[in-house]
């Protein structure tokens, strides 16, 4: 079976997590870092960098074990995807990027103004060197 790293990107409420759960692969996203062992989500902005480090670490561990991975994060800016492109190359994983563009309403209470700012900062992924 082919080792695969799938990145699912999109604005909050676009269906990233829902789509990721349909893949036969280990699923990680930075938001998982903020879920406690009782399943309660508690976002802490000051820990966002740690959440992304955790997500990258879990992805690398799975790929090193030859387990395919799907990562669902907003990935608004190209540089946010760059570590994953490097991981795919390092572990010989086939890379796929999927963009979610629907608007189902976000479950984490992200303010509409914040989503608009993210929209304005959105960059296409194709120009990221692989």
What is the predicted function of each stretch?
Residues 22:
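Active-site signature of alpha/beta-hydrolase-fold catalytic machinery across serine-
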Residues 15:
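Conserved glycine(s) of the Walker
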Residues 8:
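Hydrophobic anchor at the beta1->P-loop junction of P-loop NTPases
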Residues 26-39:
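Short beta-strand-centered segment that lines the nucleotide-binding/catalytic pocket of NTP-utilizing
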């Amino acid at each position: 079976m082919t080792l695969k790293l799938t990145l699912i990107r999109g604005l909050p409420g676009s269906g990233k997590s829902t789509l990721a759960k349909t893949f036969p692969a280990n699923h990680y996203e930075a938001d998982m870092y903020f879920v406690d062992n009782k399943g309660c989500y508690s976002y802490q902005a000051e820990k966002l960098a740690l959440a992304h480090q955790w997500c990258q670490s879990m992805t690398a561990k799975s790929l090193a074990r030859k387990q395919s991975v799907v990562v669902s994060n907003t990935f608004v800016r190209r540089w946010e995807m760059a570590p994953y492109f490097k991981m795919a190359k390092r572990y010989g994983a086939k890379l796929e990027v999927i963009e979610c563009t629907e608007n189902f309403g976000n479950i984490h209470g992200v303010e509409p103004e914040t989503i608009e700012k993210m929209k304005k900062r959105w960059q296409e992924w194709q120009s990221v060197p692989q």
